[in-house]
Swiss-Prot record:
The gene is erlec1. PROSITE patterns: MRH. The keyword Disulfide bond applies. It is found in: Endoplasmic reticulum lumen. This is Endoplasmic reticulum lectin 1. PANTHER family: ENDOPLASMIC RETICULUM LECTIN 1, OS-9-RELATED. InterPro entries: Man6P_isomerase_rcpt-bd_dom_sf, MRH_dom, OS-9-like, OS9-like_dom. One of its GO terms (biological process) is ERAD pathway. Disulfide bonds join C110-C123, C198-C231, C214-C243, C342-C355, C419-C453, C434-C465. One of its GO terms (cellular component) is endoplasmic reticulum lumen.
């Protein structure tokens, strides 16, 4: 087939058929253009078939004749394709995206993203700040900060709003898109310039592009912060305000069904396809496990799925995402705070174990030599309280509606095994952070080593959201009322 005749399918069935095609001939007058951005799915209804009257439209003369490597012939009826953008194609006469975001800019609202070391502050329509707070001796607070960009004053005035409306009315502005989790998503860019000078770029000011994307249930959260080139950043913000503009709404592409009817002398489905699907079923259907294997499968539900990530500019050590079983939140919180439920993470040679209020271990398991364990840090309440007098154990943030909440707590675990390099005991700061997620029982664990044998362990989970506000002045947590 020619390149323009290729179809993208939802699944492997169509690919198998097309790979076995020798030739195709077209029925009707004109074959519609096919796009790789639109998904298709093959169906095999047989010779007696009535086209659907609802949904995606079809025409009797809109078909191609497909011939497989086994000389089987099929008449494949093609849809008049839908791409999910029908509403977007209509004329829109509402406010421009800039005007829709104007209330957010005028509110003097700020959003925050807390990572293991850095905190990112986006004050919409004003500036982006990256900072780290640390208490020094004598309770003096030390702040390391960089401005990643500032908004020019004219950009958020009524003049700027009128300019956006003028562009919308006279010549609609190009809609930019970004690949977010595998989906091309429309966004509205806001440029921030004149940030803190960058020593790596001859003291040129830092700059950022803030990408606002539609999310109906969001509260202007920061989805991600990335340094795309040296001292140039991209910040993705979720906001419900853009959802009022049809061209910025997220849409999933509908699957377009292609109905292939067998022609005289051909089976209902291609023989090669039937054979392949049979092989796939054999692979997917293992022997029924015995009782011991079933128990092992249950234990594996508590296992950790590991994957590497990059966190800020710090040296990456490990990361793990644990999917906790469906225990009740109350039971899970009690087990977590008692230290009886521990989190595991890590990739490569070393793995990590964190038990709240007990210890942080680094270990390696070998079938021949057994388990090797290094104590990274051990909990001692008095040592943590002394540490908390000089460091920030409980950090706050103000939500867009003006409510002050705890954003993160930090705990000190010292007295670990002696480090061969520094000849000092290992120690680790454990940072617990609320993380909103569609999966209420998902936990992300990552470890950094900003200095030799001095670690930062990050633990983020929706479960932690329920207990952060119980933190006392030392950052210690308790079971909520």
């Amino acid at each position: 087939m020619r390149r323009s005749d290729r179809l993208r399918c939802a699944g492997a069935s169509l690919l198998v058929v097309l790979c076995g095609v020798f030739r195709s001939s077209f029925g009707g007058r004109t074959l519609p253009a096919l796009s790789d951005d639109i998904p298709f799915r093959l169906k095999w209804p047989g010779p007696d078939f009535t086209l659907p009257t609802a949904g995606i439209p079809y025409k009797e003369d809109n078909y191609i004749i497909m011939t497989t490597a086994d000389k089987e012939k099929y008449k494949c009826l093609l849809p008049l394709m839908a791409n999910g953008n029908e509403e977007q194609d209509g004329e829109y006469k509402g406010p421009s995206p800039g005007a829709l975001l104007e209330p957010l800019f005028k509110l003097s609202s700020c959003s925050y993203r807390i990572e293991s070391y850095w905190t990112y502050e986006v004050c919409h329509g004003k500036y982006i700040r990256q900072y780290h707070e640390e208490k020094e001796t004598g309770q003096k607070l030390s702040i390391q900060e960089y401005y990643l960009g500032k908004m020019m004053k004219k950009s958020t005035t009524e003049a700027g709003e009128n300019q956006e409306e003028k562009e919308s009315a006279e010549s609609p502005k190009e809609i930019y898109t970004k690949n977010i989790e595998g989906q091309m998503t429309p966004y509205y860019p806001v440029e921030m310039i004149n940030g803190t000078p960058c020593s790596l770029k001859q003291n040129q000011p830092r700059s950022s592009t803030v990408m606002y994307i539609c999310h109906p249930e969001s509260k202007h959260e920061i989805l991600s912060v990335a340094e795309v080139t040296t001292c140039e950043y991209e910040v993705v913000i979720l906001t419900p305000l853009l959802c009022n503009h049809p061209k910025y709404r997220f849409r999933t592409s509908p699957i377009n069904d292609i109905f292939c009817q067998s022609m005289p002398g051909s089976p209902l489905r291609p023989q090669s396809l039937v054979k392949l699907e049979h092989q796939k079923e054999e692979i997917k259907s293992p022997l029924k496990p015995n009782k011991e294997e079933e128990q092992q499968l249950l234990r594996e539900k508590f296992s950790t799925i590991h994957k590497p990530v990059t966190v800020g500019s710090q040296q990456q050590v490990t990361v793990g995402t644990t999917h906790i079983s469906r225990l009740t939140d109350e039971q899970l919180i009690k087990e977590f705070l008692s230290g009886s439920y521990c989190f595991h993470g890590g990739v490569g040679w070393w793995k990590y174990e964190f038990c709240y209020g007990k210890y942080v271990h680094q270990y390696h398991e070998d079938k021949d030599t057994g388990k090797t364990t290094v104590v990274v840090g051990t909990w001692k309440a008095d040592e943590h309280q002394e540490w908390a007098k000089k460091n920030l154990a409980r950090a706050y943030m103000t939500t867009p509606d003006g409510v002050q909440t705890v954003k993160t707590v930090s705990h000190f675990y010292g007295g670990g095994d002696v480090c061969e390099v520094s000849e000092q005991p290992r120690q680790v700061i454990v940072k617990l952070k609320c993380k909103e997620s569609e999966s209420p029982h998902a936990v992300t664990v990552y470890m950094l080593e900003p200095q030799t044998c001095q670690y930062i362990l990050g633990v983020e989970s929706p479960v932690i959201c329920k207990i952060l506000d119980t933190a006392d002045e030392n950052g210690l947590l308790s079971i909520p009322n």
